[in-house]
Amino acid sequence: MNVLLMGPPGAGKGTQAEMLVSRFAIPHISTGDMFRAAIKNETELGRKAKAFMDAGQLVPDEVTIGIVRERLAQDDCRQGFLLDGFPRTVPQADALEETLKELGLELDAVIDIHVPRERLIERLTGRRICRQCGATYHVLFNPPPTEGLCGKCGGELYQRSDDSRETAENRLDVYTRQTQPLIEYYEAKGRYKRIDGEQDMAAVFKDICAALGRDAE
């Protein structure tokens, strides 16, 4: 089962990735993890990637693709994998297709967890942190006993600047610009599956498994 998992910030993609990896015993392959491993192991591509990152530059596609290829060629991917955070552009998707073909693999499905924009903004802007003890709350999912006050120490709760509505809007705008061409790309290949991410975690997971033709339990 070779799956690409997509979803905007706030869609719960990380949670679903953990559940899929646990249920089907496949490796979770994220771009960040791949870069960190390649740099730690001091592979040739890892050294190249580190040089660009240290200079504050984007890592070129050819280096990224090379690191992805090295990871997908490892033995633990022969029985399936969950790809997360790559590809981000159509040229990267084309390169991934070619890489998978060379390795005798192919994507079985592209799962996109969809949540309406306003709901995503509610999720992204709902975090509150205690100024005194650092406890974290969420106004929707884990509200404090008393609004604005920490339930542990009574300290004042505040919203971090990177949890503001403006920041959330910008993050979602960037994501939409990046991924819309990818959605059309995978729709044309007949692999795209859109999942309703407004449901509870278990229902979302069940729908993902159904889209993959697998049992959730």
UniProtKB/Swiss-Prot annotation:
Reactions accelerated catalytically: AMP + ATP = 2 ADP
Molecular function GO terms recorded: adenylate kinase activity; ATP binding; zinc ion binding
GO aspect biological process, one term: AMP salvage
InterPro entries attached to this UniProt entry: Adenyl_kin_sub, Adenylat/UMP-CMP_kin, Adenylat_kinase_CS, Adenylate_kinase_lid-dom, P-loop_NTPase
Enzyme Commission designation: 2.7.4.3
Domains: entry comment: Consists of three domains, a large central CORE domain and two small peripheral domains, NMPbind and LID, which undergo movements during catalysis. The LID domain closes over the site of phosphoryl transfer upon ATP binding. Assembling and dissambling the active center during each catalytic cycle provides an effective means to prevent ATP hydrolysis. Some bacteria have evolved a zinc-coordinating structure that stabilizes the LID domain.
Name by which UniProt lists this protein: Adenylate kinase
Organism: Heliobacterium modesticaldum (strain ATCC 51547 / Ice1)
